[in-house]
UniProtKB/Swiss-Prot annotation:
It is found in: Nucleus. The lineage of its organism: Eukaryota, Fungi, Dikarya, Ascomycota, Saccharomycotina. This is Transcription factor SPN1. GO terms for cellular component: nucleus; RNA polymerase II, core complex. It comes from Saccharomyces cerevisiae (strain ATCC 204508 / S288c). Keywords: Nucleus, Phosphoprotein, Transcription, Transcription regulation.
């Protein structure tokens, strides 16, 4: 073999399976270098071949065969280079197609955004109006007929409840009468207690207040609050719930006359078996209900107080006369005048005095009918000075007031 055959570089073939860009580039660079070396070595080989041909004809034939082999190798390398480039382009095309498919949604989104931004304000406004018309609920107009039907329905509901309350009260009365006659303690009146939650739920609704009062449901409330045939009061839960509901209802005088509820509430204010909390609530209801009857105002400023002039001399004379009368009574009865004071003693205080022991003071309630008339003249507002010397004026007014009071006490 010739030196050209020995020194011929090996071409690195790239398989179609190798799809990486770095390996393809390295093979292309190696082929370019090999071609350059082959081109530089061709003149030397031709010169050697001519010299050998002159020396030996057989060597000339060998050189020609070596040149033909080199040309065939170069053509094969060029064909491999073309094959490598085509393989590279096929892989790239597949990747580019995949990337184009993934980028299509983003391009479409951008195009839709551009169309939305390019839309005119008028078209956008029309679209918003259409959406508003679709989403907006139609207004339901109530007619007079619907209102009448609603009132009629509420009236029927209250009347049904009234009948149920009357039936429950009558069943409890019958149960108690049978218990009294037979002496069977197992008979318990529970009908009103079972119906109580329904009654409280209706009475506590503010929108049904007028319907309750107009349909005289207070009459059934009165029947529930009345004492039972054996003299006992209804259960505490019934009393508490019904009084709380009555406190929230706007009861008027005509409703009290029609239902007769006022007499039962007065009974609860006077009975000693009623709880203190319920008794106070009953007194509050009576005060509110009787105020419009007697024409009294609930405003304290409108309250009229009877006034009388206070005469200290007259009071002193009266106290002296009362003390003299008490001494005469004590002397006639033979008791020690010092054992009892000028005031009238109670039985407890008299018993303590007989045992020569001190009596605990008893709580007394004083109720005044008349208020004393104020005899102090109003101090003018301009009498008080502001600034330097204001304290002097205050002290002078204080002296005047004290001197006037001292004169009256004398």
């Amino acid at each position: 073999m010739s030196t050209a055959d020995q020194e011929q570089p090996k071409v690195v073939e790239a398989t179609p399976e190798d799809g990486t860009a770095s390996s393809q580039k390295s093979t292309i660079n190696a082929e370019n270098e090999n071609t350059k070396q082959n081109q530089s070595m061709e003149p030397q080989e031709t010169s050697k071949g001519t010299s050998n041909d002159t020396k030996d004809p057989d060597n000339g034939e060998k050189n020609e065969e070596a040149a033909i082999d080199e040309n065939s190798n170069v053509e094969a390398a060029e064909r491999k280079r073309k094959h490598i480039s085509t393989d590279f382009s096929d892989d790239d095309l597949e990747k580019e197609e995949h990337n184009d498919q993934s980028l299509q949604p983003t391009v479409e989104n951008r195009a839709s955004k551009d169309r939305d931004s390019s839309a005119t304000p008028s078209s956008r406004q029309e679209l918003e109006e259409k959406l508003d018309r679709i989403l907006k609920k139609p207004k339901v107009r109530r007619t007079r007929r619907d209102e009448d039907d609603l009132e009629q329905y509420l009236d029927e509901k209250i009347l049904r409840l009234k009948d149920e309350m009357n039936i429950a009260a009558q069943l409890d009365i019958d149960t108690l009468n049978k218990r009294i006659e037979t002496g069977d303690t197992s008979l318990i009146a529970m009908q009103k207690v079972k119906l109580l939650p329904k009654v409280v739920s209706v009475l506590s609704k503010a929108n049904l207040a007028d319907t309750i009062l107009d349909n005289n449901l207070l009459q059934s409330v009165r029947i529930w609050l009345e004492p039972l045939p054996d003299g006992s009061l209804p259960s505490f839960e019934i009393q508490k719930s019904l009084f709380a509901a009555l406190n929230d209802l706007p009861v008027k005088t005509e409703h009290l006359k029609e239902s007769g509820l006022g007499r039962v509430v007065i009974f609860y204010t006077k009975s000693k078996r009623v709880e203190a909390q319920l008794a106070r609530l009953a007194e509050k209801l009576i005060a509110e209900w009787t105020r419009p009857i007697i024409g009294a105002s609930d405003n304290y400023r409108d309250k009229r107080i009877m006034q009388l002039e206070f005469d200290s001399e007259k009071l002193r004379k009266k106290s002296v006369m009362d003390s003299a009368k008490n001494r005469k009574k004590k002397s006639k009865s033979g008791e020690d005048p010092t054992s009892r004071g000028s005031s009238v003693q109670t039985l407890y205080e008299q018993a303590a005095a007989r045992r020569n022991r001190a009596a605990a003071p008893a709580q007394t309630t004083t109720d005044y009918k008349y208020a004393p008339v104020s005899n102090l003249s109003a101090v003018p507002t301009n009498a008080r000075a502001v600034g330097v010397g204001s304290t002097l004026n205050n002290s002078e007014m204080y002296k005047r007031l004290t001197s006037r009071l001292n004169k009256k006490h004398k």
